[in-house]
């Protein structure tokens, strides 16, 4: 409710309990009742679904209200400041995922001349290539789920959650940019915001279009194959693919994601220091979404809520297991980084209205333990790559091993498998053959505990290899975020080992850009 009142407009924040199918009219009525009338405007600050009591599932909404009946002052709103000035500096960014896009956008806004080099294709072309891949099984180096415009996140659930507490300004900038590019405004206040792959495929190109309008350049379907150095600095990178040649620059940002093993090895060969870091591996589980809904809500659907989601953990002493990247109403996809590997991931659209739900079930994995002692970053990549190849070599194809959860926890052999969202074949298999014994035992125990927490969990299927929860290695970054031994090299995003997910990676890209700007004189 708008007002042109000349009286002082005060501010207050209120919390409302609302039915899941509340209307805009009901929301305004409840606000008016809470502040005892008067003219007011409002905005939703936070909204979460409270399903602790299945007989009384509702939204809890935190509302910021401005009204002539209130006396409080509104909170100070801080925004990320990007100062534009004339600069004679060229920045070459490798990778067009969240970190690369937002680092590039900020730097281009600040007056730098930025070129993005991306191994994969533009989003629309990438979608065509993926469709062809799923029909033929022929892997396209430039058109898979891992690489291309928007990174792996373009073909995901588009989750925008982040547990990082030190990125509030960067996070707000990311959300504002996404909303401006077409994301639903609700992402700014949902406790578990998500965009959906169908919307991301339009939003990301819109952001890239803004970047280009500012003068930025993007080279798709080309990969960095060589690094040229001049003393303690990188002077240029060599690229091959749709474009071939040498790209010179004053600063270089590698935002290549954690599936680019070739780039990791190139950087390591140039003396960039990486170390191993904790990460997790496991498989995907899939259920009928209706069964998940009923287990969580005791009803098949809930008006006003797209689909039920779960977040499960299990104490598997020693160690633990947990669900990761749950995709309600989604599907499982073959997210192989190359033609000899097999890795699964989950994705869903904005409506989350598919028949199936899927999630990773993973447990921490020690590369040192697998190697029998201390291990270099390069050797760590070899170990993980070998595991990804093992899943491909199972059938020398992108079909994947799978088993019913009930058979896994009872030690039985799976004879047949139910219908699945996966676009390739599921092959009944003994999943214990693909994992180190201690890893598999933790995963199995985790499944047993999850079956006690969700009564439909035993009805599901485990499938494939989930190995991309986070990077297996981490680069050494100086206080100014440069990567030793170079003074003009920055490594950010998931590939750096310092972030995970769309928002934290985008924020890391922004922080990298700001640090570069601060050091540029």
Region spans (language model):
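Residues forming the flavin
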Residues: 4-57, 63-155, 159-177, 181-521
């Amino acid at each position: 409710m708008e007002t042109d009142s000349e009286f002082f407009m005060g501010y207050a924040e209120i919390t409302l309990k609302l039915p899941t199918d509340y209307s805009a009219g009901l929301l305004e009525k409840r606000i008016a009742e809470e502040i005892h009338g008067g003219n007011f405007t409002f905005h939703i600050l936070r909204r979460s679904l409270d399903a602790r009591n299945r007989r009384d599932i509702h939204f809890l909404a935190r509302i910021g209200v401005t009204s002539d009946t209130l006396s409080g002052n509104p909170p100070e709103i801080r925004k990320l400041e990007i100062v534009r000035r004339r600069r004679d500096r060229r920045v070459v960014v490798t990778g067009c995922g969240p970190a690369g896009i937002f680092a590039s956008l900020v730097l281009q806004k600040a007056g730098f001349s930025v070129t993005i080099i991306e191994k994969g294709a533009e989003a629309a072309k990438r979608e065509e290539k993926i469709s062809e891949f799923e029909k033929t099984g022929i892997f396209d180096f430039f058109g898979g789920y891992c690489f291309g415009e928007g990174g792996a996140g373009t073909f995901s659930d588009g989750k925008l959650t982040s547990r990082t507490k030190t990125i509030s300004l960067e996070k707000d900038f990311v959300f504002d940019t996404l909303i401006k590019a077409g994301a639903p405004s609700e992402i700014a206040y949902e406790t578990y915001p998500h965009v959906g792959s169908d919307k991301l495929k339009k939003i990301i190109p819109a952001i890239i279009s803004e970047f280009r309008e500012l003068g930025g350049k993007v080279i798709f379907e080309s990969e960095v194959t060589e690094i040229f150095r001049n003393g303690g600095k990188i002077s240029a990178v060599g690229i091959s693919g749709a474009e071939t040649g040498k790209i010179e620059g004053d600063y270089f940002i590698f935002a290549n994601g954690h599936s680019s093993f070739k780039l990791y090895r190139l950087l390591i060969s140039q003396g960039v220091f990486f170390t191993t870091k904790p990460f997790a591996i496991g498989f995907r589980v899939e259920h009928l979404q209706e069964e998940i809904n009923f287990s969580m809500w005791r009803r098949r659907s809930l008006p006003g809520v797209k689909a039920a989601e779960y977040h499960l953990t299990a104490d598997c002493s020693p160690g633990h297991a947990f669900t990761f990247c749950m995709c309600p109403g989604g599907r499982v996809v073959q997210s192989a980084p190359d033609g000899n590997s097999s890795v699964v991931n989950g994705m869903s659209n904005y409506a989350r209205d598919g028949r199936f739900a899927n999630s990773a079930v993973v447990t921490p994995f020690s590369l040192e333990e697998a190697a029998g002692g201390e291990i270099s970053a390069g050797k760590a990549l070899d170990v993980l790559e070998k595991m990804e190849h093992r899943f491909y070599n199972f059938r020398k194809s992108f079909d994947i091993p799978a088993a019913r959860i009930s058979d896994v926890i009872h030690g039985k052999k799976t004879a047949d498998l139910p219908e699945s969202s996966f676009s390739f074949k599921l092959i009944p298999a003994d999943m214990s053959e693909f994992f180190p014994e201690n890893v598999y035992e933790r995963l199995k125990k985790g499944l047993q505990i999850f079956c006690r927490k969700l009564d439909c969990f035993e009805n599901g299927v485990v499938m494939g290899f989930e190995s991309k929860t986070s990077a297996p290695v981490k680069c050494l970054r100086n206080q100014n975020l440069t990567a030793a031994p170079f003074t003009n090299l920055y490594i950010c995003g998931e590939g750096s080992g310092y972030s995970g997910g769309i928002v934290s990676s985008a924020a890391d890209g922004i922080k990298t850009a700001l640090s570069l700007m601060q050091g540029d004189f």
